Swiss-Prot record:
GO terms for cellular component: cytoplasm; excinuclease repair complex. NCBIfam families: PRK14670.1 (NF011264), uvrC (TIGR00194). Interacts with UvrB in an incision complex. This is UvrABC system protein C. Keywords: Cytoplasm, DNA damage, DNA excision, DNA repair, Excision nuclease, SOS response. The lineage of its organism: Bacteria, Pseudomonadati, Spirochaetota, Spirochaetia, Spirochaetales. It is found in: Cytoplasm. GO terms for molecular function: DNA binding; excinuclease ABC activity. PANTHER family: UVRABC SYSTEM PROTEIN C, UVRC/OXIDOREDUCTASE.
Length: 603
């Protein structure tokens, strides 16, 4: 328990000192507690101090990981905390009741709009500003707007002017007609202030403030000073919660040397509820990566597609991607790009979170590689790992794959696929297959004077490991590169120097790296084998009378056209259970295919 907390504390000491929110999670990734902080590192470190309340002690016993979202200000962190708690309802947080969020300013969608305070968003085309954490200051600003601009307060039409009209605070729209243009001017003035255009108003307040001080009217001076403070505070650009009913995702790509970080900031009902960090190796250009990511991310089975997807890339054609997502998911989402003051602030937050996520990701990879180095008794960090796997279907079309990982991340530019030639048709010999793949790969590296990997991973057990090592030894590079194997049954790691095997706990970062390499090699080998088989069956289907099932039978029970050549028509008929006429056509096809290949080889 103490060791786990010590490890977690080490990660906390590397957190940023900026403002933001943090999520404490248990071993099942369930969120236990959400908090905010002006200084994330300092606040989270306080949970590890000896003097803790009983409740915090219980909480910390269950905390296995901590995630953070950075913000541009403490104010944004406060609002974000509220939204996250409402969304996730963690066990250790106070449960906020629905409808009791922070207040907003609403400009109603009416002939003569009213300006009101509200805690609920109504989908009636009203305009909303906020929310605002300081209710007192919000009330002061509303009072200022109502007294400065002639906005109606009455809800119903009247036959006589109200008190506000007589006080000069209303145009009298409750009983007068045709005041739309004049009234809209007053509304626009109020909107201008709420949109942050307050410099002129502040100048006027400063003049009045000086006059009040000169007259020693300190009561008025205090009110004017409070009003100035309120206007400044509520007109801070608020980017964590945007008061509208849209569900919108902001997708930002942060390019890196070895890996790109893709951050998705998710707003639901106008509220930021989640930061999703994704990582991809740096092969594609930025615009290509964004388009590929959008397709893979938003067409996945469990992904809810928002109303709009905002990308931070200009002049990228997203029409086809948008159409594809909408067709697959039966939605009407829009992929957009805009440049506004508010969106630039969101981009700043996305960049901050992307950098943080990348640091966390790289720290995890480095620690995992350090562990792997120790377990495998290596002198150097396994920065470059090459993984091998063999695939076949009952000895047919045996192939090998070689994948490369750099710093724990796939490096696809370096992948290799091998069609193996050392095995006879139908022969299953993984050891000989491994030998051929290793020989071809490392003979090429030696001849071309390329860089050797730090570690070679073989999918298999002791036999496969010995086969690979024998080739490395024959090439005289057995001392220059470490080789190990990973057996699927118990995920046991075998070394030449330790054939008893190493069994790491499931989920161990070092084991996970090896599993990722093994699984990627497995995926590539199986994909190549399948592609080879599909190519052959496609050829067989050109034969008159051969469909998919018969083509599969020929491949499975006989093999390629070369395997057909030595067989008689009767043997073909008997092996795949077809009539003699079809067997004859199959034989003729094989002879023709062979002659074409021979002509091609002579050219």
């Amino acid at each position: 328990m103490k060791e786990a907390l010590t490890s977690l504390f080490e990660k906390v000491t590397k957190l940023p000192t900026t403002s933001g929110c943090y999520k404490m999670l248990n071993e099942n990734k369930k969120i236990l507690y959400i908090g905010k902080a002006k200084n994330l590192r300092s606040r989270i470190k306080s949970y590890f101090l000896e003097k803790k309340s009983h409740k915090i002690k219980i909480l910390m016993k269950n905390v296995k990981s901590i995630e953070v979202i950075t913000t541009n200000s403490e104010y944004e962190a406060l609002l974000l905390e509220c939204n996250l708690i409402k969304t996730h309802k963690p066990d250790y947080n106070v449960k906020l009741k629905d409808g009791k969020g922070y207040p907003m300013i609403r400009i109603t969608h009416e002939k003569y709009p009213r300006i009101l305070k509200t805690r609920k968003i109504i989908n009636d085309q009203s305009e909303y500003f906020g929310p605002f954490t300081n209710v007192k200051k919000l009330d002061q600003v509303l009072d200022f707007i109502n007294k400065t601009f002639k906005i109606r307060k009455c809800k119903k039409k009247s036959n006589a002017p109200c008190l506000y009209y007589h006080m000069g605070q209303c145009l009298g729209v409750c009983y007068k007609e045709n005041l739309e243009k004049e009234y809209q001017i007053e509304v626009n003035k109020a909107k201008s202030i709420l949109n942050g255009n307050i410099s002129e108003i502040l100048s006027q307040i400063d003049i009045k403030l000086k006059l009040a001080v000169q007259k020693e009217d300190f009561e008025t001076a205090i009110k004017l000073k409070e009003m100035k403070s309120s206007l400044i505070e509520i007109n801070q650009i608020q980017i964590v919660t945007k008061a509208n009913n849209l569900n919108i995702d902001y997708v930002y790509v942060h390019p890196g040397e070895n890996v790109n970080t893709i951050i998705v900031l998710k707003y639901r009902d106008g509220k930021l509820v989640e930061r999703d960090a994704n990582f991809d190796e740096s092969i594609c250009k930025k615009d290509e990566l964004v388009l590929q990511f959008l397709i893979q991310y938003y067409t996945s089975i469990n992904m809810i597609v928002p109303d709009k997807i905002h990308i931070f890339l200009k002049d990228v054609d997203t029409k086809n991607v948008e159409k594809l997502i909408n067709e697959i998911k039966n939605t009407k989402t829009e992929i957009i790009y805009k440049e506004t003051k508010e969106i630039l602030k969101i981009m700043e937050m996305a960049i901050s979170n992307a950098k943080l996520s990348l640091r966390e990701y790289e720290n995890k990879s480095n620690k995992a590689l350090e562990s792997l180095k120790i377990f495998l008794e290596m002198d150097k960090l396994p920065k470059i790992i090459e993984g091998f796997d063999i695939a076949h279907l009952k000895g047919q079309e045996t192939v090998a794959s070689m994948v490369t990982f750099k710093m724990g991340i796939p490096f696809k530019e370096n992948y290799k696929l091998y069609k193996l030639n050392s095995l006879l048709k139908g022969e299953i010999d993984d050891f000989r297959a491994i030998k051929e793949a290793i020989l071809r790969r490392y003979s090429e590296i030696i001849n071309k004077k390329l860089e050797l990997p730090n570690l070679i991973l073989i999918d298999g057990g002791k036999g496969q490991l010995s086969a690979a090592f024998s080739i490395l030894k024959s090439l005289k590079i057995e001392d220059k590169v470490k080789v190990c194997s990973l057996a699927k049954k118990h995920e046991t790691i075998f070394l030449i120097t330790n054939k008893k095997g190493i069994n790491l706990p499931q989920g161990h970062p070092a084991l996970r790296i090896l599993q990722n390499v093994r699984d990627e090699a497995h995926r590539k080998a199986n994909g190549f084998n399948k592609k080879r088989r599909e190519k052959i069956t496609l050829l067989y289907k050109k034969i008159d009378g051969v469909g998919e099932k018969t083509a599969q039978k020929i491949l499975k029970l006989i093999g390629t056209y070369k395997d057909i050549l030595p067989l008689s028509e009767n043997e073909i008929s008997e092996k795949i259970k077809v009539n003699i006429k079809l067997a004859k056509r199959i034989k003729e096809f094989a002879i023709k295919e062979n002659s074409i290949k021979n002509i091609d080889n002579d050219k």
